[in-house]
Amino acid sequence: MKTALTIAGSDSSGGAGIQADLKAMTMNCVFAMSAITALTAQNTTGVSGIFEVSPEFLAQQIDAVFTDIRPCAVKIGMVSSAPLIETIAERLRFYKAEHIVVDPVMVATSGSDLIASDAVRTLRRELFPLAEVITPNRHEAEVLSGLHISGRADMSAAARAIAADCGCAVLLKGGHSDTDADDLLTFPDGTEIWFPGKRIANPNTHGTGCTLSSAIAANLAKGFALEEAIARAKAYLTDALNAQLDLGRGSGPLDHTLGGVGVENWMHGVPDAVHK
């Protein structure tokens, strides 16, 4: 069985963070493991507290995983401080980790800040160069590129700037658009691939970014090329949104079980182009 590791924060409400990561990875048929960067007191209405682990303890968790069940892919989510980012980068370089997906989580769905401003610079310097792909949303891409994004041309310019600066592929997510959910994959050489997506009428989007990046990592772990891994991950996320789970008083979580259909039934429904 293929394996994947998520390095991210814990969401006490279960909708985002490592909880969403583990669910998404499991539904995409890999053995999922975790190293926790922080505990958050969080629900669908906001984040009321963040308790970081120490860099030393984070390193211990990563060591425990790599020295026993080596992950075939690694997803990195919420890392709120520079020392933790530096620790992750050092350990991943030491173990020569493969198929690294970085979701540069900066703001929760509820609007709460999740990363210190100085940590963004460290993220760019230490982790992005190790990544196979990073998965910013529109707001995160604006921070990383310094450009305002209001349409497809802006998405293209921002993604090209980030990819050239960081030396890795960039999947700029279009889910914050008012008209569609098209995502743009851009490589450092300027090659672009658009992934069309249908906007789903569902206000409950807590954990969508975590879910997508974890599903991408899971499919990279299974040996799919990046473009294919993204297509499969988008298909899974779309179905999780379409399940229309409605929990909590704010922006609620996704249904990672896809309405209880089970992974085998879901996989039978994935288009042939995605299976191949």
Q: For each predicted feature, which ranges?
A:
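Short pre-catalytic strand/loop immediately N-terminal to key active-site residues, enriched for Gly-Thr
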Residues: 7-13, 192-206
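Conserved N-terminal subdomain of the carbohydrate kinase-like
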Residues: 2-6, 18, 25-110
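Nucleotide and nucleotide-moiety/phosphate-recognizing core
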Residues: 83-96, 168, 182, 188-191, ...
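Phosphate-handling active-site elements
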Residues: 29-33, 193, 219-233
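Charged C-terminal helix
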Residues: 49-52, 227-276
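Short, small-residue alpha-helix embedded
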Residues: 142-143, 202-226
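Conserved phosphate/ATP/ADP-binding segment of small-molecule kinases
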Residues: 117-192
